[in-house]
């Protein structure tokens, strides 16, 4: 998917994230994002009971994915915007994509990582939990992003130029060095120096997810989302055993640590660009997966989305750009 299309998807994400500065309780039946942005119901696009076979409903969403990566988003306090931009595009040197002005006072910020994006959304309104106390092991949810770079000196120079303290790297015993820093909004970023890696983490992004029940979460990402489960790995820096699940350039790292004193399901989330959001919606309903935001259209962006939650409330957001293709047929074995 080209940068223009990805930009539109980013615009929709932040349009949702930048809803109303002062959130109000929506009227009954109105569809909103966690931040309160209003969307149009797309229930007319939903598959009817009996329209899909049990095999279609119980298969994963893997064959709906388009493009070589997923996207992630990061919500943060609005007053941290300038520092966040300096951190992600200066210290980390992620590619700055064209921002989109949503209103006179609200702007969408996009950074590129390979074919995907880290989307920066100012504002933490809504009914989501924002609690990164305890860092990587403090509670459930997305607790860190993992970015890779080829050269340590270049990273150190960029941090200094951007006005941030120099990170301290430690050897990992596998030819890499790593450090853990926090962005200006208090979210951990693991930086890995890996010989041969693309600069600006253009090999993609890693997403660390602390799970309350590792087996249940692994099943969700394996059998529903349909990510490629890989062999467990040890992260020496974090002191964790990680269970990787891949989607092209994007890797989710599941783990279980701590006593879940500080669950967080609002600071970050995952977006999958797909060919048929209503089909993802149907599969979710068949398995009683929690729906964060029902099937909807976002006016002005030609976007059909459904926001689902993993077992710990992590946002797994399915976004379809453009009209839905011909409905899946029972005979297709989708």
What label would you give each PLM region?
Residues 1-2:
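N-terminal secretory signal peptides that target proteins for export/translocation
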Residues 5-16:
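Bacterial N-terminal signal peptides
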Residues 18-22:
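Sec/Tat signal peptide C-region and signal peptidase I cleavage site
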Residues 23-79, 108-112, 129-209, 232-236, 240-246, ...:
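Vicinal oxygen chelate
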Residues 28-29, 34-36, 53, 63-66, ...:
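Core segments of cupin and vicinal oxygen chelate
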Residues 120-128, 190-194, 254-257, 319-321:
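Amphipathic N-proximal alpha-helical interface segments
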């Amino acid at each position: 998917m080209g940068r223009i299309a990805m930009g539109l998807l980013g615009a929709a994400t932040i349009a949702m994230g930048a809803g109303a500065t002062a959130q109000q309780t929506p009227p009954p039946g109105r569809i909103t994002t966690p931040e309160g942005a209003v969307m149009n119901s797309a229930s007319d696009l939903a598959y009817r009971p009996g329209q899909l076979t049990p095999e279609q409903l119980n298969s994963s969403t893997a064959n709906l994915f388009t493009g070589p990566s997923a996207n992630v988003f990061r919500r943060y306090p609005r007053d941290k915007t300038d520092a966040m931009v300096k951190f992600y595009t200066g210290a980390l040197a992620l590619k700055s994509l064209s921002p989109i002005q949503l209103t006179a006072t609200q702007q969408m910020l996009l950074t590129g990582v390979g074919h995907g994006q880290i989307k920066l959304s100012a504002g933490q309104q809504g009914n989501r939990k924002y609690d990164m106390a305890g860092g990587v092991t403090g509670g459930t949810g997305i607790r860190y992003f993992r970015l890779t770079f080829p050269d340590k000196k270049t990273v150190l120079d960029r941090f200094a130029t951007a006005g941030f303290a120099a990170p301290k790297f430690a050897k990992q015993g596998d030819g890499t060095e790593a450090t853990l820093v926090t962005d200006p909004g208090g979210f951990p970023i693991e930086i890995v120096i890996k010989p041969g890696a693309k600069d600006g983490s253009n090999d993609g992004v890693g997403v660390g997810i602390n799970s309350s029940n590792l087996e249940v979460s692994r099943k969700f990402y394996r059998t529903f989302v349909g990510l490629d489960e890989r062999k467990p790995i040890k992260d020496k820096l974090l002191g964790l055993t990680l269970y990787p699940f891949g989607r092209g350039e994007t890797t989710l790292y599941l783990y279980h640590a701590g006593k879940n004193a500080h669950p967080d399901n609002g600071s970050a989330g995952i977006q999958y660009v797909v060919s048929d959001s209503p089909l993802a919606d149907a599969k979710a309903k068949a398995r009683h997966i929690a729906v964060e935001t029902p099937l909807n259209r976002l006016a002005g962006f030609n976007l059909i989305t459904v926001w689902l939650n993993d077992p710990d409330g992590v946002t797994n957001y399915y976004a379809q750009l453009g009209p839905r293709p011909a409905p899946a047929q029972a005979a297709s074995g989708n």
